[in-house]
């Protein structure tokens, strides 16, 4: 059992309720160990898997053994899920190497959370309206439409003035400048749910949710220095945003204070930023733990309806990992995808061009196949 799991090939844990599925050849072959769970398995009382199946780049290799190790403590179950991952040695937070950027990230995230705690004492409807409006502007237009679908995946093209405007909206979400955000996300897709993934639940739910942001040394060890964003680094506008990044949210805070005083700061900055933080982070954590898989992506990505509702369609995450180039994540008519509706509107008025969608042939290649 131990020798099987230590080989440099993806490994999946499969339940007796469903037969093992063949790893789709569209998934890149990587040198890592991967633990997953069965397709469409519903939450139920914990039962150890009955077999282990090892995959290689050539497809399914039926090296099957009993999952005795799963009952002997080699695996742990991720919180409130049916996902089993191999146990790793825990790194004590305060004993690891901390860099200045780590302290800075903790300070920013903590200060926004503390500021949001004042919301009940600074409530007024104008401030709430401003927070909601900025949630749309920074969350939908900035993060999901610009940083994610446009810049990270090139799912469509926009006129440069509009591309830059939406990217500026994303910078106001206080999640990092476009170059760094896009680099991390591209590495996530390249090394998805492996030991080199910047934020995988293989390292625990909370690591994938937020703790990864406070450990730049680990991310550098996994991914190396960012070298996958040359398309953005060659553009002066994005280099400018990287250099001056923190000044832009500060300028917005000053403007909000001038418009509505401290309540606008609490709601328009604190509450809104924390809300968009956790919605974005849930895509990295919850959507790799809770939900269903519609496509044979060979990773832990899930379709999660409630994250999709909060994150403007980003919760259809298994769809996204199956067709990362697609401007549309909610592929079924009933899958709400507000970001796609905005892209579709921009396309209708001639502002979005080269809008990419998966073909029927591509869908067939990513579909689960019966044994």
From Swiss-Prot:
Which pathway, metabolic or otherwise, does it act in?
A: Lipid metabolism; oxylipin biosynthesis; Lipid metabolism; polyunsaturated fatty acid biosynthesis
For the motif Histidine box-3, give the residue ranges.
Answer: 317-321
Q: Where is the transit peptide?
A: 1-67
Q: Is Transmembrane tagged as a keyword?
A: yes
Which tissues is this protein detected in according to the database?
Highly expressed in young leaves. Low expression in roots.
Q: How does it sit in the membrane?
A: Multi-pass membrane protein
Q: Where is this motif: Histidine box-2?
A: 185-189
> Where does the chain cross the membrane?
103-123, 127-147, 251-271
Which transformation does this protein catalyse, written as a reaction? a 1-acyl-2-hexadecanoyl-glycerolipid + 2 reduced [2Fe-2S]-[ferredoxin] + O2 + 2 H(+) = a 1-acyl-2-[(7Z)-hexadecenoyl]-glycerolipid + 2 oxidized [2Fe-2S]-[ferredoxin] + 2 H2O
**The keyword DNA damage belongs to this UniProt entry's keyword annotation:** no
Q: Chief location of this protein?
A: plastid
GO molecular function per UniProt: palmitoyl-[glycerolipid] 7-desaturase activity
Give the subcellular location: Plastid, Chloroplast membrane
Which keywords appear in this protein's UniProt record, sorted alphabetically? Answer: Chloroplast, Fatty acid biosynthesis, Fatty acid metabolism, Iron, Lipid biosynthesis, Lipid metabolism, Membrane, Oxidoreductase, Oxylipin biosynthesis, Plastid, Transit peptide, Transmembrane, Transmembrane helix
User: Which cofactor names does the annotation list?
Assistant: Fe(2+)
Catalytic activity, EC: 1.14.19.42
GO annotations of cellular component type:
chloroplast membrane; thylakoid
**Pfam families, alphabetically?**
FA_desaturase
Question: Which BP terms does GO give this entry?
Answer: oxylipin biosynthetic process; photoinhibition; unsaturated fatty acid biosynthetic process
Positions of short motif Histidine box-1: 148-153
Please share what else the UniProt entry notes about this protein. Answer: Substrate specificity shifts from delta-7 to delta-9 desaturation when the protein is retargeted to the cytoplasm.
Q: Which family does it belong to?
A: Belongs to the fatty acid desaturase type 1 family.
Chain's role: Fatty acid desaturase involved in the first desaturation step leading to the formation of hexadeca 7,10,13-trienoic acid (16:3(7Z,10Z,13Z)), the major functional components of thylakoid membranes. Required for chloroplast biogenesis at low temperature. Also indirectly involved in the production of the oxylipin dinor-oxo-phyto-dienoic acid implicated in wound signaling.
What's the record's remark on domains? The histidine box domains are involved in binding the catalytic metal ions.
| Protein name per Swiss-Prot or TrEMBL | Palmitoyl-monogalactosyldiacylglycerol delta-7 desaturase, chloroplastic
Organism of origin is Arabidopsis thaliana (Mouse-ear cress)
Q: Recall the taxonomic lineage recorded for the source organism.
A: Eukaryota, Viridiplantae, Streptophyta, Embryophyta, Tracheophyta
């Amino acid at each position: 059992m131990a020798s099987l799991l230590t080989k440099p090939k993806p490994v999946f844990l499969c339940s007796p309720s469903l037969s093992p599925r063949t790893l789709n050849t569209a998934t890149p072959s990587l040198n890592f160990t991967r633990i997953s769970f069965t397709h469409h398995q519903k939450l139920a009382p914990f039962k150890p898997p009955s077999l282990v199946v090892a995959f290689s780049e050539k497809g399914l290799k039926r090296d099957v053994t009993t999952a005795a190790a799963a009952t002997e403590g080699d695996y742990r179950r991720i919180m409130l899920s049916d996902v089993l991952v191999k146990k790793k040695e825990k790194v004590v937070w305060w004993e690891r190497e901390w860099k200045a950027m780590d302290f800075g990230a903790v300070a920013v995230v903590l200060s926004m959370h503390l500021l949001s705690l004042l919301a009940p004492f600074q409530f007024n409807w104008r401030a709430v309206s401003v927070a909601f409006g900025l949630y749309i502007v920074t969350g939908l237009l900035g993060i999901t439409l610009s940083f994610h679908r446009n810049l990270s995946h090139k799912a469509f093209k926009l006129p440069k003035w509009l591309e830059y405007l939406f990217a500026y909206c994303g910078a106001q979400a206080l999640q990092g400048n476009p170059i760094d955000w896009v680099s991390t996300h591209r590495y996530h897709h390249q090394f998805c749910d492996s030991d080199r993934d910047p934020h995988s639940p293989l390292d625990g739910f909370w690591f994938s949710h937020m703790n990864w942001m406070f450990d730049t040394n680990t991310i550098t060890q996994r991914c190396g220095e960012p070298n996958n964003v040359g398309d953005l680094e060659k553009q002066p506008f994005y280099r400018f945003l990287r250099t001056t990044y923190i000044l832009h949210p500060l300028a917005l805070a000053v403007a909000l204070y001038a418009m509505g005083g401290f309540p606008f700061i609490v709601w328009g900055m604190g509450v809104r930023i924390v809300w968009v933080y956790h919605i974005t982070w849930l895509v990295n954590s919850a959507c790799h733990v809770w939900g269903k898989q519609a496509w044979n992506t060979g990773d832990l990505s899930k379709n999660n309806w409630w994250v999709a509702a909060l994150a403007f369609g980003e919760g259809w995450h298994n769809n996204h990992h199956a067709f990362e180039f697609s401007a549309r994540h909610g592929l079924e008519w009933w899958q709400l995808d507000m970001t796609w509706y905005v892209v579709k509107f921009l396309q209708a008025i001639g502002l979005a061009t080269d809008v990419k969608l998966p073909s029927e042939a591509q869908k067939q290649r990513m579909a689960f196949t019966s044994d």
